[in-house]
Amino acid sequence: MSTPFGLDLGNNNSVLAVARNRGIDIVVNEVSNRSTPSVVGFGPKNRYLGETGKNKQTSNIKNTVANLKRIIGLDYHHPDFEQESKHFTSKLVELDDKKTGAEVRFAGEKHVFSATQLAAMFIDKVKDTVKQDTKANITDVCIAVPPWYTEEQRYNIADAARIAGLNPVRIVNDVTAAGVSYGIFKTDLPEGEEKPRIVAFVDIGHSSYTCSIMAFKKGQLKVLGTACDKHFGGRDFDLAITEHFADEFKTKYKIDIRENPKAYNRILTAAEKLKKVLSANTNAPFSVESVMNDVDVSSQLSREELEELVKPLLERVTEPVTKALAQAKLSAEEVDFVEIIGGTTRIPTLKQSISEAFGKPLSTTLNQDEAIAKGAAFICAIHSPTLRVRPFKFEDIHPYSVSYSWDKQVEDEDHMEVFPAGSSFPSTKLITLNRTGDFSMAASYTDITQLPPNTPEQIANWEITGVQLPEGQDSVPVKLKLRCDPSGLHTIEEAYTIEDIEVEEPIPLPEDAPEDAEQEFKKVTKTVKKDDLTIVAHTFGLDAKKLNELIEKENEMLAQDKLVAETEDRKNTLEEYIYTLRGKLEEEYAPFASDAEKTKLQGMLNKAEEWLYDEGFDSIKAKYIAKYEELASLGNIIRGRYLAKEEEKKQAIRSKQEASQMAAMAEKLAAQRKAEAEKKEEKKDTEGDVDMD
């Protein structure tokens, strides 16, 4: 049975949650952290994923890829590329499809991976984390992504999940997942005809900022308006601090960290920590040892200075709030509560700016780091056939308007807007077109100016075939079921021809009609389904052949990672055995080995140790196993003697304890019998006495 799994795919850290035991739990990783760094690194033999990748980032900086969600679907020539590239330490390259990939050195060779592949590697890692925690099969996942993600980016994430061996039951907007988390845990929401509770959610994470206005009633939520600033997040604060110190240290220490990626990354990491310290303190020291050229750097920063550094960012706080309220057709006064989520909302000056934008105090009833993952896990559980969850209905809204167009055959019109921006999804629309034969359709963004420059206008296209004209007709009506699915992806679910036929329907008899009254009929025209048509879709999703190729590649790398981990484990086991056995041979095992055995085994241990630190330092799993078994063949004999003697001692102790217990029981029994006998004698003496008075 699969455990429903929710993934908050963060730019800096990701959070995992599962639905189980009538609740939703956060999954901790291998080092017991409640979030996992969204990092993929590459080494001489294997990949470094999550915590390992983060730990090795400074020493493996050119072969470590972070900020994964920012290059998903990113065109190499997109205006955003220049802004994104400054956050990457690995080399970004243009792929054959004009998208952005990363070039790294892996297993001694140069490799280029697409953003989808990199995301798949990380998702595969967190899938294993959930599997280790739950001890269950993991197949279904709901992944939370930013609302500003385009159709292409959502397909890329879904494909990444499939490459990782998962079924993406839903790609959900992250702030909507937080809203679901709010709705399922709140017990005081209005019901029935009561006025809905209006809640604004402000989510500022590592790289982007979203404001969403939602209406809540018990068991349901409806998104009313959403707006984003995709270049406003915690990393921008970190970068501002880093650039400040880069200038200061250039003057103060005559070093330029901008020329040294490792040094720059160390200052950036320290800047992130400083930012967090300043959230609780008005001043904080800053220092990094041997940052470059053996130079130690130190300084300090005040909260006031930080606010001045990020002043251009703070001036943009109100814009998403204003836009979200406008789309929701509400004023700030009509908002009942303002919930803040995302790690960056802990910054005091940001809190103040958000509060001022709404003119009311902020609420923190949700866990700022975990609400999205928990909501995603609940949504995944809704799709599970094996779990029963409380009913909860939610509707999101289209961030961009989408129109459908078709070959012009009969109609004057050849396109129409089907899903306007701000309309709810999932949703289905039926349209009818008169067709003269097979035709094609396409879905496109209605107003490309709503999207970032260079975004592909067309979302998908379809070929509809199998149209048969009835004899004597020059066209046939075709009904199409257009769908925006729960993940926000646009499809044509069904296409079929229809025809009008005449049928006879009985005319209802009057209530006072006699029982033998003759039934009369009338002819009516009904529209009925005639022939199903074939739909061939061309979307941003990977075709089956390419998907299978990438699945195979991922499985090969996964097998290599596993082999390297097992080899390292065997190596460590051998090393530990050498030291442990050598120590025991001189102590507790000494009486149980002959001088010849000791000499032989000591020689074997010395030889194995020399091999381990020489040619065996980088050997294969089988050789480590063979060396271990060679030592154990003699070591286990001596150990067996020791254990046998220990067992004899234990048995002797047990026998002594048993004998002592038996003696004690016998003594106790004898005492009881003596007491009983004395009691009987005393009774007998009492009965023999005669009162002479």
From Swiss-Prot:
Q: Which residues carry this modification: Phosphothreonine?
A: 242
Recite the UniProt keywords alphabetically.
Acetylation, ATP-binding, Calmodulin-binding, Chaperone, Cytoplasm, Isopeptide bond, Nucleotide-binding, Phosphoprotein, Stress response, Ubl conjugation
Just give the chief location class: cytoplasm
Record region (Disordered): 653-693
Q: Which domain of life is it from?
A: Eukaryota
Localization per record: Cytoplasm
Single biological process term from Gene Ontology: proteasomal ubiquitin-independent protein catabolic process
SUPFAM superfamilies linked to this entry: Actin-like ATPase domain, Heat shock protein 70kD (HSP70), C-terminal subdomain, Heat shock protein 70kD (HSP70), peptide-binding domain
Q: Provide the induction entry.
A: Increases a few-fold upon upshift to 37 degrees Celsius.
What this protein is reported to do is described as: Has a calcium-dependent calmodulin-binding activity. Required for normal growth at various temperatures.
Q: What else is known?
A: Present with 71700 molecules/cell in log phase SD medium.
**Which protein are we looking at?**
Heat shock protein homolog SSE1
Q: Say which species the protein is native to.
A: Saccharomyces cerevisiae (strain ATCC 204508 / S288c)
**Classification lineage:** Eukaryota, Fungi, Dikarya, Ascomycota, Saccharomycotina
- Gene designation per UniProt: SSE1
